[in-house]
């Protein structure tokens, strides 16, 4: 889904087969399938899952430093989300958007939400007894517990830095993503109008805004750190705003959208400027700074190094997959194995938190097992997450009944909120600039 899709149907990077697609009667260029983007999802989600619970699997400090940087990698998910959203809603080699996609902006929004909310609702409801028990064991009042339930089901938790990691902590991502989906019907058509020059300036501007936020956090705390497992930030709420806030997520999503549009405006003979492998390795190698004297905090690594390199990687692997002989890494991420694993990224992401709480949340594990599970159990936990993700994907995410119900709900919600994302009195066309140009 949105994990980018975050595996969702509406975000699938497949507007048609490259071999079978034919130009439409209106002469618009058909978009080829780029499965390699879907295959990249698993390479992001698996280290994030590792990072959340690796401290229960090893005492090796170097490994812990290296693998507990999930807050760096999550930027890649936002970039992919924006990349796919722009690719599926704007026109190839044209400075325009697909009017049909945004004809009903409310429907666009609710379809996006319904591509991930059913699984979130299912896991939240099945896990509610455990989540509520945890709240009560932590001496939270029933009022606080009720507020946590409301924030979880309404996907509003990312707006509240003190509550962002309630119940199923990784779902703050969905909370931030929902706000971005709310804004995209207004923003993407404007981005689609930009030339390559305008898109480049937009990328620079958005990156600068993102960097300012990270500089603000770093100035308030410090620029260097030993890793989240070794030291805690002195300003946890500021840290939550820095990594969770929906506005920050929107900036990174739009970076991905601008990158996709830049590639979509390439001419047919445009070649990749570099083997995508080097950009992929460089982006992940930025995590290695944690093992050096240049051990910048996660926020700085994410914005200064990982995001620019990973976004450039997405652009080049996109270009490369359109070539007659794509590079090995492009074929690998576009392979059946990686696209299948990419489809598991979203259910694994949603499930790994509750499963981890069962085995590693102290108050819960003590009640169930007498204590947290030993380190030798950690590989079995990872296997359980993958198996659970597979069955959830096969029997819930792919379920025709679930998809039909989601589509029906999206339609009903769109009808109920008609006009929410559009002006009931659109402005009449203003010809003043045309008259001025003529004069």
Feature-to-residue mapping (PLM):
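Aromatic-anchored segments of alpha-helical transmembrane domains
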Residues: 46-53, 129, 158-159, 206-219, ...
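Transmembrane alpha-helical segments and their boundary/interface "anchor" motifs
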Residues: 71-78, 90-136, 141-155, 178-184, ...
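Non-transmembrane, juxtamembrane loop and terminal tail segments
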Residues: 5-28, 411-439
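Membrane-interface helix-boundary motifs at transmembrane edges
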Residues: 189-198, 263-274, 295-297, 329-332
